[in-house]
């Protein structure tokens, strides 16, 4: 089904691979207004609705002997709770930040995984707006954590570490300021964006090539069209890899958000 929905428009039988225009689909509703909605926006709405439905169905009738759906949901929640939140923040601080870190993980996962779902075929996190919003949420969380514990001394202590020689303070302060308050959110957003863009481009390339080989080259009687078997096999394998990447990037994003909170709460501040 990915093959059927690959972007394979051709001109005079030529092959056209993926392009950045995939990430700027035409408006569907409210064109030309601040509320313009395109295909990617609809995918994001769909992901939010599906996530809410999954958690509502999974928690409305909890049973002592759990169903398979309840087991799967509990496994996912316990994975995030133990392997990201508790292992990074500990029990006390973990309880305080459990909800936002879990929300970040499942939201990023849901947005990422649409890139391999037939007829959606593009990640909701593959344009810069959403990664920026998620990075800003993480930014607010770790700054809030630092201010909550240390007051506004948090900013001073973050850019002026203790024990630094006086002559090195200006250089160290600039480095710490940039790395803590600028590079953290920027790298969070760009890491997620670049992984999703690259994955989409490779998948579309594989399945576009497959359709071209089968329905253009082979249909004309040229047996070079059998190369489509190889591109299809590579696309199928890469689809599984993209599933792994979708989960991994959700884990990395949530883990780094928790790590930045932990650094803000560290006693050195």
Which ranges hold each PLM region?
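Selective transmembrane helix interface/packing segments
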Residues: 2-269
